[in-house]
């Protein structure tokens, strides 16, 4: 996974479409005025957040994030969105978006299923601050737009949960066509599992057979720059969402046999179990610092069968309980239950 975000040139055109001048946005964001002139626009997480705050401040339109995330013109879709649109189903599209997102940024799309619900969440892995509300709006609108266009029907989330304080409820509920909960413990888009299983009328196996191998080759090339242990831990962190992926699952992600993966890990003096523990520990710290999730919910997302198992593991890692660790590491901007509206 890259440590920088690649900003699509399509964003510049979208800004112009909604009446915003890119240079004014850059000035407001405190970013280099020549940023958008680069052939490949790469920014840090901090710069990305500044960019979206700049867009919000210049626009003053509470719906700007929803507009930017809902692209109607397929010719402006990036390769990840096109691959998603050609997928077999909404589920397949979500999985491809999560997998290929690694190519463009240090961000993860996490998909967690529980009962008859499927929750989609975005995690900014290198963030030291709360993500701008406009960015969340755009990401959620993007997911819903792909689902609606792919199925050819008005696929609506079951609910949307937002950490920020309540603002513009009617606007959000009209766009997503579902209840919106403000002051939530996390930003999450929740679908009925039945809707996630819907087939895509836009499915194109022939074109997907051309595009997917190219994306897989890029992903393989990028992952090859890391040790096998780093690759395994990254995959585990992406797949740990209410489940505990096994060696066979991870080997499949790497296009390796389980025996080959075991041999390579042994060569690096690593074990699958230790990498699982490392991934859980790092994710636990991320959840405790950057969300106000209840501890039993955190345990579930880390693949533990019950909260007590998580508490014991965490105490083994840190020598203290999750709640005490969270309290001792809390500082301004790190942990907060609500986020102010961008407009």
What are these regions (language model features)?
Residues 44, 136-139, 277:
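Short, conserved glycine- and acidic-residue-centered signature motifs
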Residues 109-197:
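DNA-contacting interfaces and partner/effector-binding or oligomerization modules
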Residues 56, 98, 140-144, 148, ...:
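Generic solvent-exposed, charged/amphipathic alpha-helical segments
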Residues 3, 17, 131, 135, ...:
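Short, contiguous, pocket-lining structural segments
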Residues 77-83, 125-129, 196-197, 217-219:
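Short hinge/gating elements
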Residues 1-120, 142:
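N-terminal low-complexity or simple alpha-helical regulatory segments
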Residues 166, 170-343:
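Extended mid-to-C-terminal alpha-helical interaction segments
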């Amino acid at each position: 996974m890259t440590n920088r975000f690649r900003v699509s040139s399509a964003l510049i055109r979208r800004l112009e479409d909604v009446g915003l001048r890119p240079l004014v946005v850059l000035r407001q964001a405190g970013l280099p005025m020549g940023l958008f002139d680069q052939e490949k626009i790469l920014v840090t997480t901090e710069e990305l957040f500044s960019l979206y705050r700049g867009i919000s401040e210049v626009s003053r339109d509470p719906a700007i994030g929803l507009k930017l995330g809902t692209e109607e013109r397929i010719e402006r879709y990036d390769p990840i969105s096109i691959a998603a649109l050609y997928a077999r189903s909404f589920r397949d599209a979500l999985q491809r978006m999560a997998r290929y997102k690694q190519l463009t940024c240090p961000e993860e799309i996490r998909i967690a299923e529980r009962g008859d619900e499927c929750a989609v969440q975005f995690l900014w892995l290198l963030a030291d601050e709360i993500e701008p509300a406009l960015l969340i709006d755009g990401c959620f609108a993007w997911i819903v737009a792909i689902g609606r266009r792919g199925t050819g029907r008005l696929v609506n989330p079951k609910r949307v949960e937002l950490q920020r304080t309540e603002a513009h409820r009617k606007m959000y509920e009209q766009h997503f066509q579902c209840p919106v909960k403000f002051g939530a413990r996390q930003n999450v888009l929740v679908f009925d599992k039945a809707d996630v299983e819907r087939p895509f009328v836009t499915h194109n196996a022939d074109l997907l057979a051309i595009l997917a191998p190219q994306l897989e080759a890029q992903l393989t090339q990028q992952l090859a720059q890391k040790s096998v242990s780093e690759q395994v831990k990254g995959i585990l962190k992406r797949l740990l969402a209410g489940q505990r992926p096994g060696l066979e699952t991870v080997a499949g992600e790497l296009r390796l046999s389980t025996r080959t993966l075991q041999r390579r890990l042994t060569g690096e003096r690593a074990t699958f179990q230790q990498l699982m523990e490392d991934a859980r520990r790092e994710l636990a710290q991320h959840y405790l610092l950057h969300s106000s999730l209840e501890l039993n919910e955190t345990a579930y997302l880390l693949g533990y069968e019950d909260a007590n198992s998580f508490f014991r593991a965490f105490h083994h890692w840190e020598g203290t309980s999750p709640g005490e660790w969270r309290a001792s590491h809390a500082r301004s901007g790190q942990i907060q239950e609500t986020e102010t509206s961008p407009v």
